[in-house]
From Swiss-Prot:
Catalytic EC class: isomerase
Binding positions (Mn(2+) 1): D384, H388, H444
Binding-site list for substrate: H121, R150, D151, R181, R187, R252, N253, D254, R255, K317
Coiled-coil annotated spans: none
GO terms for MF: manganese ion binding; phosphoglycerate mutase activity
Lineage start: Bacteria, Pseudomonadati, Pseudomonadota, Alphaproteobacteria, Rickettsiales
Annotated protein name in UniProt: 2,3-bisphosphoglycerate-independent phosphoglycerate mutase
Keywords for this protein: Glycolysis, Isomerase, Manganese, Metal-binding
């Protein structure tokens, strides 16, 4: 029996909410979604904690979600892996090489990383452990703090800076620059933002304050929250030297690449660069925790069958449907086509909650109509990226936009005889306000996410499961045997 072509729609940040007043998905106008969940087979998937390879209770994120969906197994994520290994980092050969190089040249260490306990891109405890180790070798550490305010509350930096100051009080370390992640962790080629952070770190240019707390107070007094703090030089810091070493403490790669790339390109004299992980196959820097290869992902299985597949997303989420979905592989598989639609050029996405969803759908529908792809994977970024702004009305518009796009995809799938699957990578827009703290909620959630099958052959029902069960379910619909590497399970029951 030949299987069906499948269109897999991943709705970023679209969790199962409570239906309360701050649930943007429930509050938005979503006629297609309402019909789909009432008429099509539907179940719920766990997208956080140990079910996606994270520590218990840790919220999911886009990287982890796409890895789990695309690989069909629970992959031990960097956060949990580093948690297990960080106390032995003083023995890590790459760290020892890094230290020896600095000692031989008489330089200092520049440590760059996101300062929070959000656990999405970094963990402050990792940074603090490494600072203690490096200063223990007699090396001065300049810390280039990136403020979060996105995976944690928007005005929480005082807590994290206070914790860091307490940690380094008796160590040969100091905060050299402070910048919001809006500048230091852009991933949408807004190089003007990246350049402001780079100039502060490399050349000590930009606004200057006497201390990190003073800089934060000035920012708050100007109405600017953590994420958007303008890169600021602290104290007497005067920039990098060729004899120095640079260590990035973020373990997730997508929001490191622009700043790292700028450093490698514009300051090639600094050759001693170390990362928590291998951020890119093209940027060959040493890593404390090298990647572990993942074989027989969904994309690889489709390719091995000689079938064509398509990945499509806008800039903000393109890496997720390609690199992460393929288990950390940068190059496309044979037969894998990729389409990237530019994200809109706005400072924050609540200014354009539609983002590029309509343009994605225009291109996607054309490809579905061609019937050349056995598997099509699309990401709609709206609920997540607009959810991160904390703007409820904008989030509702974002959700409504995605709903209208899903309707177009559904009609195209039906006309092409394809099965349409709808799921999400993690929650976000279903919780837009934190009642306890009386402030907008901008972070991810630990909500379950939906899993809906539209236009399937025959009478089927779905079991609840985990994100890692999506790939086996796709293979089941395509009538392709599931490889033993995939430990997830098809969620389909065929009712005869």
């Amino acid at each position: 029996m030949s299987g069906s072509n499948v269109v897999l729609c991943i709705l970023d940040g679209w969790g199962n909410g409570s239906g309360g007043r701050y649930d943007a998905i429930h509050a938005a106008y979503t006629p297609f979604w309402d019909t789909a969940v009432s008429c099509c087979p539907m179940s719920s998937l766990s997208a956080s904690g140990t079910d996606v390879g994270l520590p218990s209770g840790q919220v999911g994120n886009s990287e982890v979600g796409h890895i789990s969906i695309g690989c069909g197994r629970i992959v031990l994520q960097d956060l949990l892996r580093i948690n297990l290994e960080i106390n032995e980092v003083h023995k890590n050969p790459k760290l020892l090489d890094f230290v020896r190089d600095i000692q031989a040249k008489g330089g200092v260490c520049h440590m760059i990383g996101l300062l929070s306990d959000g656990g999405v891109h970094s963990l402050q405890a990792h940074m603090e452990t490494i600072i203690e180790v490096i200063t223990g070798f007699g090396i001065k550490v300049f810390i280039h703090v990136i403020l979060d305010g996105r995976d944690v509350p928007p005005r929480s930096a005082e807590k994290y800076i206070g914790m860091l100051n307490a940690k380094i009080e008796h160590l040969n370390a100091e905060i050299a620059t402070v910048a919001g992640r809006y500048y230091a962790m852009d991933r949408d080629n807004r190089l003007d933002r990246t350049c402001k952070a780079y100039d502060a770190i490399a050349y000590a240019t930009g606004p200057r304050s006497g201390s990190a707390m003073e800089a934060l107070e000035k920012s708050y007094n100007s109405g600017v929250t953590d994420e958007f703090m303008v890169p600021t030089v602290i104290g007497d810091y005067d920039g990098m030297g060729a004899e120095d070493g640079v260590l990035f403490t973020n373990f997730r790669n997508d929001r490191v690449l622009q700043l790292l790339g700028m450093l490698l390109h514009r300051f090639p004299e600094v050759s001693n660069v170390l990362g928590m992980r291998q951020y890119s196959e093209k940027m060959r820097i040493a890593s404390l925790f090298p990647p572990r290869e993942i074989h027989r992902s969904l994309g690889e299985v489709i390719s091995e069958r000689g079938l064509k597949q398509l990945r499509i997303a806008e800039t903000e989420k393109f890496a997720h449907v390609t690199f992460f979905f393929n288990g950390g592989r940068e190059e496309p598989f044979t037969g894998e086509d990729r389409i990237i639609i530019p994200s809109p050029d706005v400072s924050t996405y609540d200014l354009k909650p539609e983002m590029s969803a309509v343009e994605i759908t225009d291109s996607l529908v054309e490809r579905i109509n061609s019937q050349q792809y056995a598997l099509t994977v699309v990401n709609y970024a709206n609920a997540d990226m607009v959810g991160h702004t904390g703007n409820m009305e904008a989030a509702k518009k974002a959700v409504t936009t995605v709903d209208s796009c899903l309707q177009r995809v559904f009609y195209a799938a039906v006309n092409a005889g394809a099965v349409m699957l709808i799921t999400a990578d993690h929650g976000n827009a279903e919780k837009m306000f934190d009642v306890q703290n009386d402030s907008p909620f901008t972070a991810h959630t630990s909500s379950m996410v939906p899993f809906v099958v539209c236009n399937a052959d025959g009478d089927i029902s779905l079991s609840d499961g985990r994100l890692c069960d999506v790939a086996p379910t796709v293979l089941d619909l395509m009538n392709i045997p599931q490889p033993s590497d995939m430990t997830g399970c098809s969620l389909i029951t065929r009712n005869s």
